[in-house]
Amino acid sequence: MRFQRLRQAATLCFVAAFVAAPAAAKTISVKAGTPDANEKLQEALILAEPGDTVELGAGVWKLTDGLSLDVDNVTVRGAGTKDGAGSILDFSGQQGAGEGLLVTSDDVFLTNFAVLNTKGDGIKSKGANRIVYHQLRVEWTAGPKETNGAYGVYPVESSDVLIDSVYVRGASDAGIYVGQSKNIVVRDSIATENVAGIEIENSFDADVHDNIAAKNTGGILVFDLPSLPQQGGHNVRVFENIVSDNSTPNFAPKGNIVASVPTGTGVLVMANRNVEVFGNVFDQNGTANVMIVGYRYDHKDPNYQPLPKAIVVRGNQHGKAGYAPAFDGGAQIAAAMGGAIPPVLWDGAGDAIVLDEVGVLSLNLPDVKTPRDQAKPTPVTLKGTPPAALPEIKLPASMEAKVQ
């Protein structure tokens, strides 16, 4: 009797385990060029289960509608990003104004495909924790145009974000944008011919390193803006990037905050705190290599703090800068200073420490409500003892393993 009871118990345990076990992860392969290729692609994203991989074959999908993914722990993997050989999602004929791909689930891995010519954002993720953007190309192939989509890759309201080896060209706002998020790494990526190359906005704890931000209007922006659910951006490190020739005329639609970014801006820090800018290579940024400013626009947010605080600029290499300052009065200031302004420009609001052996120009506007036309540009020294260095951002090991 005892043996029979044990055998029955073992059988019940086996059945329970079988029922509780998740289905084995599978690969859903999708081919381009078939009559129903578009439907099969969206169907694969809908039917995918946690652990699955949606595998995109080489070829071009001519898409008229945006795609979406709302299943956790899914990989979307293509065959490459190059025209003629990779997996190309072409939205040139898109009917609506939405994004190309919208992700709203956790633990998603996007890798090795291209998204072209979306009417809205290229790839957007919202509330998608532990998301990885890897080896992607997002491009508006006709180059800078006001009618291009706003953002290339656009994670927002997320924790643990990795953007690695991504190429973005032609975004009318920011090529690589991370907003209202926490614990962020943007690395080994290229942003070119966007209004803002890379932008970290209203976010906490970010490392932006080993990127190339070239031929944008502004290379790398670190902003904090009012009237958003998450504000008080802080603890951002911008280091070991190449920030050069950011000379593209600003083509952002009027009314966007980035429409105010002067052509020729290298790194622009606005109203953030605890930001370190170090080890970067700057060259050929006509307005300034580094700008540090307060938020000088009308707002109705009583909790908003508009000043930059604890900004540290150190150990950077400065090439030519300040020879074509594109802000109001900039040309006159440059002429008065012999043809160029110093590589570092501070509006005089908040506080900053600049340890680089280059000139710093202050506009002497400590109150952000003071009109810009009351600026009194003066060379200044901003030496001092910086606060303790910010720590390196660590992402979950499971995220790093995906890109190894």
Task: For every predicted segment, state its role.
Residues 26, 52, 59, 65, ...:
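The right-handed parallel beta-helix/beta-solenoid scaffold, focusing on the short coil/turn
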Residues 41-42, 64, 90-101, 117-124, ...:
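Extracellular beta-strand/beta-solenoid scaffold signature
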Residues 1-10:
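Bacterial N-terminal signal peptides that target proteins for export
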Residues 9-20:
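Bacterial N-terminal signal peptides
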